[in-house]
């Protein structure tokens, strides 16, 4: 069982709070999938690209004393590789210890960036886009929205998914939706 919701504002501007609207719809579907919630939302394109990635799973934080050092090492490796490729990080946000949002400037091949970054053990890119942001984590919509500040997300459209794992693990990697690697905004 899962739940899916979406919204499109054809004449929306940057003042439409789709994060709050999506959270409300997905929270109403939490009985269809309480394990994890994911959002794919399209905000305003400001000319930069948004890189969302994780350096661990949420469950990893409970299982190992060494994970916190590994998270720091992975994040340092991500930063070093971005610098090596000439990616300029304009803004960094870390809604959780393991999930990160970078606003970047780069005019080269983003597939090369994605491959180089994902080659770091434990690192997974969730999305890259000029307007797409893919956010997913464990818990229902209110939990994920609170963690990531999604009730302040303005944009034009989005789709979301609540998941009850039946055949795979309960983790961020298995949560929906997925980014269409390596395509920007898909």
Feature names for model-found ranges:
Residues 1-186:
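N-terminal glutamine amidotransferase
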